[in-house]
């Protein structure tokens, strides 16, 4: 057959014969057909080793194959080929690896060879040869041959396919000793699964399915050494390391070194002579050999990740991976704290910085002197204040800043930089608001115990003291159980559980009785009260009530936490101090109960406490174990509990856990600490260490050391005695570590050492002060009883602040000397993982498909205080002398409150250097009787209000007193009975006129002795509208020392300034802009610009201003930040600006102007903003400029260019349009006093200004000016040369068209009546034209000052001013002496007087009031399944739906009701832009700040009127004035209704001026309500 086959495939001798052979079939054997065989490839899999093994253990590796998706495919291979190699030089091999987890070993790929090919060829050739013989021999011959020789029969072999095998595709690795090779059936093996009895809900055993192919593969018991295990499935191969050693290495890594302890795997005894190397994977850091105690010290700076490699004497190899990171970083620590934790917008914040430079846990020095740059960040991340202060090593540093008056509520961050490092601090801001009625929750008892029903009363009162009748009260009660641990109440659960919901209604006295269920267990009750009077949003009050146990809590203590068997231990039971003077019920202790935890056996004994509840009783512990000792009263209520341990055989610990119990919680230097160490099983040895920044001490359990003494109690329990040295402070970690049966167990326990601290004392000369008295505090500082000098920081703060917001800053002692974290990292060689992902060695990319995959205010009720001063005193640096004493004084604020005195101290001298301390104390300001004025103090001349006062009775009984009031039309002398708390007193007016301007004197007398006196100044405004006026009086009109002023008889708020040179005129204009009352985006920006210019001028000259006038006006810096925030709040979509926030569409001019103002302001206050912040200017210009006048576009580009933005391209477009529109129709010229920018930007003068500005800007940016624009520029300059407008003249001056001597008279024409943007832009151009200003000249006059006459003050930018305090306007100005220069100076007299009111606009103004009456919502009838819930929902929503009832002239208004104030504007012709409506209000009235989702039925003019209640929406934003509110009207071209929700809380009769509409940039263009003389009807409020 072989010969025939050979002949059949013989190659012909010639090429043409070969072609002939190919063309005709083989007469004997046909060609071999394709087999369809594809070599087995496989899929990627993981191979890993996650443990090391001893020589007596079955070593195993883990293989994870993708069995879920590819089991059928991979099962063809029959499992996985496993090969085990021994590494000859293990340490050298490991050191050469870059990644010890995934070693780099080159595979020896050979492919599967020719076996399957030859088998297939043999099978095919055999079948073909047989068929060839069949053709040669007949059937009969073949049959006889088979009968004679049955072995010739083929049977089914002719049709059987070739059986292919899966031979290994990898040869053994070269250079390693192959110890064994086998194919492991991974698909038949049991997959890895958790034990059967393990059922942990939510754990991985529940949601991780068992994966077929995830198996552990045993490789046998191996001699000590390092091995490579290789796994092969088809073309995929992976390898991993396998460590076999009878030695376990434990490492303790620190920042500067590594300690290695080697121990026997079975017994835990130390192993000496092991060679260890410390490597970072790149090179060896240190090497060594373990000593007799098994330890080796390796010194080197620790990298973040490192490895310890080792070989013991038996050849066992071990490896440990170590990670190090600093738990404690010793550098300069800066402690920053504020005078109090909570502030209101506009408050001054005082910050103190104290620093220490730490070199270790206890070593520190004073920091180096340096600058601290402080940034204050609001809750949105925006900076609101920036300042720099100087840090001194001895006294620290302090800073002060003022919050913006519109600061957002929330958490604020103090971010400060010092010495290249950034630090942080915090405080909070909240607006204190008073709800429109008060909710008082008072309980019948001060404290409640378990089992007692809680009863109390909810009282609703309006500000005038009237009860809220039929008020709806929803009470929600939630409870959270608490537990007592060693006398301390702690929460036993995470979340309060809702118990019940009550719906109550107040009676005619405004009261509702409240009964809460009794608590069975000690609980924390959270009572939430929602009250609604049917005319406003609900007022929410939350009260927390601690329901303690039925008896007062006690503390159970003993001298030691553990003792020996048979010892009698004395326990001391003491009642805890009362909290706020409140104790629980007085059930005395009756018995003690002892429970042994190991056996649950109980022992009891009776107690005989003394009268105070104290007791000392012995307890004898017979058996070793863990005990809980409890003290209970006769009813079985737990009063106190404590744990105790008794050394000896029988104490059990949690398996796998070492228990360390110290005899005390805290130690003094020099003490001896005793520790009871209980191991989970008997041990032969263990490693004991003291750790903190490094391993400070170490010893073996079998040998002890010089720093501890050991005593064996049982084979698994030891007692250790440790001497506490100074180096232990503030804490040290004691660690016990043992190795047993291959497992490493260790436990840390802290030794806390009392940190020496300064002993501070605060002694007040009195315990209680009256408001206005001088408080004297004597402070002392001592250390260990000896006086030491120290630097103190003292704050005296209203205790109410800490009720609203607990202290944010940590204690100074905790900050500098808190317990240090343990920086030692403990690991073992048992936890090292080696792994590999199998990859194919076939050509191409790695194959396989495995693994492809608003703001809320803080409500404060009425309090006995006449000022808003929360910080009574703040002393940043108070130095005690060598005797340790210092004294401070301050004046007690006019408030009745409890004041917390907080003293923080640091000593920087002698042995006390670096010692800090903190102490709090309390003082009180109190009076038996205290008066407070609660209503407004500003009225109109014809008002007849009912004035109210609140008299606080601070005693515990009712008092009869005489109430005497005189002044301002009041004359009262009556006897009143004052109940405890707040009493509302109503003061009726008498005399003609009923109300007068002046001082109201009020007194409360007891037995002809004045208990309290109150003075309030009442101010009266004119009945009509007042207009701002200015009068310029040259000093040349002086008559000796008297200057006639010529003021009208109704002039009020008179202020005088003296101006002369350009700088003083500039300051006057800046002051006028800053004080302008309204606040659209343009006016806010126009206020920012002079503030920024003033701040830059002050910074350049180094001048520092006081806080302003005596009233405490904010400084320039604070005003800048306030206005910046206001401007930000007016921003619209995409950061663009319209005229008044989002009420108006975006404008390129307003956006550019607003960003320019913010750019100036941020530079002035030192705030850095990213360059991208200003790009919105150009984006807004692209979107909106095409619809704006050329003057607006030119101005927008000028502002953009000042900010450094590229403007060349849009500027050329403006120049081209100016040339095209030169002859286009123009708007009419503006009237005198009108704004050129907003009223007539397309007038001839507006286009001339645009041409001049555009040409000037093109020259400035280096762009050629077109000839047409050059001609227009020259013509415009000629035409405007004699224009008197300050805006025009400042532009010419900036362009060099006028001399520098002209600006003073130019600025004199910029009066307060000039439109704001025109004035602000004129200031900017003027300053640029003059190259800056040198500051205002000092006034050369000195008026005669008196209490009832002229009073000195300073304006916002620091200009001296004088204000008139007399009742009648001054006829003349009397000077103290004749000034030397009267020719160049003038007196500017600013005042307010009645405005000539006349309607000049064809607009009808109507004002209507609607009283809102709540509509009762009916309960759903079809909700039968949950009637209680339906009722609760109805009550909760009561007062949200209202019916609007029109108020008729003469109707009396209810001071407790809510009204809709509607103003309807109806233009009879034309369209009016930039308008403002001013709506007068009576004193005490206020606009609701929110609409709280109400619905109103009955308002006229609604699109869906008559279809039921409609959601109420404001038609415009509003701003409050003194006795009015105003609403912007961007465009008026059709009838428009403006509505607000208003309250009238002050009873009385009031005559109001008419509501009026005027155009902002044409102030004389007005429209008035009715006849323009008075409102439609007088307001009568009851």
Curated annotation (Swiss-Prot):
The keyword Lipid biosynthesis does not apply. Residues 1-15 form the signal peptide. It comes from the Bacteria. GO terms for molecular function: endopeptidase inhibitor activity. Keywords: Protease inhibitor, Signal, Thioester bond. There is a cross-link at residues 1080-1083 (Isoglutamyl cysteine thioester (Cys-Gln)). Protects the bacterial cell from host peptidases. Belongs to the protease inhibitor I39 (alpha-2-macroglobulin) family. Bacterial alpha-2-macroglobulin subfamily. This is Alpha-2-macroglobulin. It comes from Ralstonia nicotianae (strain ATCC BAA-1114 / GMI1000). The lineage of its organism: Bacteria, Pseudomonadati, Pseudomonadota, Betaproteobacteria, Burkholderiales.
């Amino acid at each position: 057959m072989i010969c025939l086959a050979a002949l059949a495939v013989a190659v012909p001798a010639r090429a043409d014969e070969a072609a002939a052979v190919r063309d005709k079939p083989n007469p004997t054997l046909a060609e071999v057909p394709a087999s369809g065989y594809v070599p087995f490839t496989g899929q990627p899999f993981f191979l890993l080793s996650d443990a090391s093994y001893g020589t007596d253990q079955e070593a195993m590796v883990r293989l994870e194959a993708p069995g879920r998706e590819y089991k059928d495919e991979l099962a063809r291979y029959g499992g996985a080929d496993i090969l085990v190699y021994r590494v000859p030089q293990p340490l050298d091999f490991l050191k050469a690896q870059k990644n010890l987890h995934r070693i780099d070993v080159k595979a020896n790929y050979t492919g599967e060879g020719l076996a399957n090919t030859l088998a297939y060829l043999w099978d095919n050739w055999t079948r073909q040869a047989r068929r060839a013989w069949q053709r040669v021999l007949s059937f009969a011959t073949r049959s006889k041959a088979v009968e004679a020789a049955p072995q010739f029969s083929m049977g089914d072999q002719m049709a059987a396919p070739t059986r292919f095998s899966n031979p290994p595709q990898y040869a053994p690795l070269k250079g390693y000793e192959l110890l064994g090779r086998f194919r492991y059936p991974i698909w038949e093996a049991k997959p890895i699964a958790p034990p059967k009895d393990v059922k942990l809900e939510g754990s991985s055993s529940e949601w991780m399915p068992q994966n077929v192919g995830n198996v552990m593969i045993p490789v046998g018991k191996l001699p000590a050494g390092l091995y490579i295990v290789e796994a092969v499935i088809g073309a995929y191969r992976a390898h991993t390391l396998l460590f076999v050693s009878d030695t376990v290495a434990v490492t303790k890594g620190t920042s500067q070194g590594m300690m290695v302890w080697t121990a026997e795997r079975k017994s835990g005894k130390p192993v000496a002579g092991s060679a260890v190397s410390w490597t970072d994977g790149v090179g060896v850091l240190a090497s060594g050999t373990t000593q007799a105690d098994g330890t080796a010290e390796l010194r080197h700076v620790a990298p973040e990740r490192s490895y310890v490699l080792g070989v013991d004497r038996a050849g066992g190899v071990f490896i440990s991976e170590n990670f190090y990171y600093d738990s404690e970083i010793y550098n300069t620590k800066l402690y920053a704290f504020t005078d109090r934790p909570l502030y209101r917008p506009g408050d001054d914040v005082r910050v103190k910085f104290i620093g220490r430079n730490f070199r270790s846990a206890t070593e520190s020095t004073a920091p180096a002197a340096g600058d601290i740059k402080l940034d204050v960040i609001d809750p949105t991340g925006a900076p609101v204040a920036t300042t720099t202060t100087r840090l001194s090593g001895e006294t620290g540093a302090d800073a002060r800043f003022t919050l913006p008056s519109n600061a957002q509520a929330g958490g604020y961050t103090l971010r400060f930089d010092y010495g290249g490092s950034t630090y942080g601090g915090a405080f909070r801001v909240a607006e204190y608001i008073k709800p429109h009625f008060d909710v008082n929750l008072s309980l019948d008892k001060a404290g409640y115990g378990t089992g007692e029903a809680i009863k109390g009363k909810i009282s609703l009162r309006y500000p005038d003291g009237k009860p809220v009748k039929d008020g709806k009260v929803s009470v929600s009660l939630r409870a959270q159980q608490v537990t007592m641990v060693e006398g301390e109440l702690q929460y036993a659960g995470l979340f309060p559980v809702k118990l019940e919901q009550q719906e109550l209604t107040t009676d005619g006295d405004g009261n509702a009785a409240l009964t809460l269920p009794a608590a069975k267990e000690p609980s924390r009750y959270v009572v939430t009260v929602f009250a609604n009077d049917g005319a406003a949003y609900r007022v929410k009050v939350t009260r927390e009530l601690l329901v303690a146990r039925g008896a007062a809590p006690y503390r159970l203590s003993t001298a030691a936490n553990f003792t020996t068997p048979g010892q009698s231990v004395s326990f001391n039971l003491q009642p805890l101090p009362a909290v706020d003077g409140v104790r629980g019920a007085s059930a005395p202790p009756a018995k003690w109960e002892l429970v042994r935890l190991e056996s649950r056996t109980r022992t009891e004994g009776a107690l005989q406490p003394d009268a105070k509840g104290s007791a000392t009783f012995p307890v004898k512990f017979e058996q070793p174990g863990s005990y809980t000792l409890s003290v209970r009263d006769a009813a079985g209520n737990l009063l106190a509990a404590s744990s105790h341990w008794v050394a000896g055989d029988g104490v059990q610990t949690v398996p796998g856990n070492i228990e360390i119990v110290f005899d005390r919680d805290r130690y003094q230097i020099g003490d001896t600490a005793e520790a009871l160490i209980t191991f989970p099983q008997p041990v032969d040895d263990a490693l004991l260490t003291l750790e903190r920044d490094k391993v400070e001490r170490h010893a073996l359990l079998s040998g002890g050391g010089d720093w501890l003494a050991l005593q064996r109690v049982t084979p698994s329990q030891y007692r250790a005695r440790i001497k506490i040295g100074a180096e232990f402070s503030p804490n040290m970690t004691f660690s016990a570590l043992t190795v047993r049966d291959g497992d490493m167990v260790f436990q840390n326990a802290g030794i806390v050492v009392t940190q020496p601290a300064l002993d501070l004392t605060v002694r007040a000369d009195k315990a209680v002060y009256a408001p206005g008295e001088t408080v004297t505090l004597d402070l002392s500082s001592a250390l260990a009883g000896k006086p030491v000098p120290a630097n103190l920081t003292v704050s005296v703060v209203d205790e109410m602040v800490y009720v609203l917001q607990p202290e944010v800053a940590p204690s100074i002692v905790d900050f500098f000397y808190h317990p240090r974290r343990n920086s030692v990292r403990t690991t073992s060689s048992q936890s090292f993982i080696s792994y590999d992902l199998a990859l194919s060695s076939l050509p191409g990319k790695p194959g396989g498909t495995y693994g492809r995959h608003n703001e809320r205010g803080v409500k404060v009720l009425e309090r006995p205080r006449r000022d808003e001063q929360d910080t009574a005193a703040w002393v940043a640096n108070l130095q005690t002398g060598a005797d340790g004493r210092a004294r401070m004084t301050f004046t007690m604020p006019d408030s009745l409150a409890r004041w917390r005195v907080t003293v923080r101290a640091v000593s920087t001298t002698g042995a006390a250097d670096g010692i800090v301390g903190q102490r709090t104390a309390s003082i009180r300001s109190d009076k038996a009787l205290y008066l407070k004025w609660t209503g407004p103090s500003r009225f109109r001349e014809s008002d007849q209000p009912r004035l109210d006062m609140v008299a606080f009775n601070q005693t515990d009984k009712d008092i009869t007193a005489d109430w005497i009031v005189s002044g301002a039309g009041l004359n009262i002398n009556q006897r009143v009975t004052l109940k405890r708390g707040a009493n509302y007193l109503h003061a009726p007016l008498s005399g003609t006129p009923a109300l007068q301007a002046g001082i109201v004197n009020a007194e409360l007398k007891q037995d002809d002795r004045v208990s309290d006196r109150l003075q309030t100044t009442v101010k009266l405004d004119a009945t009509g509208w007042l207009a701002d006026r200015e009068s310029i009086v040259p000093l040349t009109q002086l008559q000796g020392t008297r200057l006639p002023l010529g003021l009208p008889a109704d002039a009020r708020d008179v202020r005088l300034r003296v101006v002369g040179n350009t700088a003083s005129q500039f300051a006057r204009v800046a002051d006028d802009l800053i004080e302008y009352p309204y606040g659209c985006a343009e006016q806010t920006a126009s206020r920012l610009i002079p503030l920024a210019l003033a701040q830059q001028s002050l910074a350049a000259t180094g001048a520092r201003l006081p806080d302003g006038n005596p009233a405490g006006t904010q400084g320039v810096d604070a005003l800048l930040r306030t206005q910046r925030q206001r401007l930000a709040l007016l921003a619209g979509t995409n950061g663009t600006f319209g005229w008044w926030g989002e009420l108006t569409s975006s404008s390129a001019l307003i956006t550019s102007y607003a960003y320019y103002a913010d750019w100036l302001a941020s530079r002035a206050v030192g705030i850095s903003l990213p360059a991208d912040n200003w790009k919105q200017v150009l984006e807004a210009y692209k979107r909106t400029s095409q619809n704006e006048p050329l003057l607006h576009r030119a101005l927008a580009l000028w502002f953009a260019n000042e900010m450094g933005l590229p403007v060349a391209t849009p500027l050329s477009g403006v120049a081209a349009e100016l040339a095209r529109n030169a002859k286009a129709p123009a708007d009419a010229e503006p009237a005198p006093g009108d704004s050129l920018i907003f009223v007539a930007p397309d007038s001839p003068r507006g286009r001339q200004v645009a041409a001049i500005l555009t040409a000037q800007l093109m020259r400035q940016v280096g762009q050629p000016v077109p000839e047409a624009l050059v001609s227009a520029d020259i013509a415009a300059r000629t035409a405007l040369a004699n224009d008197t407008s300050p805006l025009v003249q400042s532009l010419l001056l900036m362009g060099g068209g006028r001399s520098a001597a002209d600006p003073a008279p130019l600025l004199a024409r910029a009066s307060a009546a000039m439109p704001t943007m025109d004035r602000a832009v004129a200031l900017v151009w003027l300053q640029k034209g003059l190259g800056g200003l040198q500051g205002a000249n000092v006034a050369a006059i000195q008026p005669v000052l008196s209490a009832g006459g002229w009073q000195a003050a300073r304006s916002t930018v620091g200009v001296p001013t004088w204000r008139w305090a007399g009742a009648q306007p001054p006829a003349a100005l009397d000077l103290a002496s004749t000034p030397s220069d009267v020719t160049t100076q003038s007196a500017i007299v600013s005042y307010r007087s009645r405005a000539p009111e006349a309607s000049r606009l064809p607009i009808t103004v109507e004002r209507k009031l609607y009283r809102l009456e709540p509509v009762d919502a009916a309960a759903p009838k079809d909700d039968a399944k949950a009637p209680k819930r339906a009722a609760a929902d109805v009550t909760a929503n009561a007062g949200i739906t209202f019916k609007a009832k029109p108020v008729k002239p003469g109707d009396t208004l209810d001071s407790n009701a809510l009204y809709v104030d509607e103003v309807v504007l109806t233009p009879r012709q034309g369209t009016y832009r930039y308008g403002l409506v001013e709506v007068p209000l009576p004193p005490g009235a206020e606009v609701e700040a929110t609409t709280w989702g109400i619905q109103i039925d009955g308002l006229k003019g609604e699109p869906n009127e008559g279809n039921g209640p409609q959601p109420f929406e404001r038609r415009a934003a509003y701003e409050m004035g003194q006795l009015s509110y105003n609403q912007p009207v961007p465009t008026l071209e059709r009838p428009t209704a403006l509505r607000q929700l208003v309250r009238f809380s002050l009873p009385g009769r009031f005559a109001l001026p008419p509501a009026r509409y005027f155009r902002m940039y044409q102030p004389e263009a007005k429209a008035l309500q009715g006849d323009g003389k008075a409102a439609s009807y007088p307001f009568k409020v009851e």
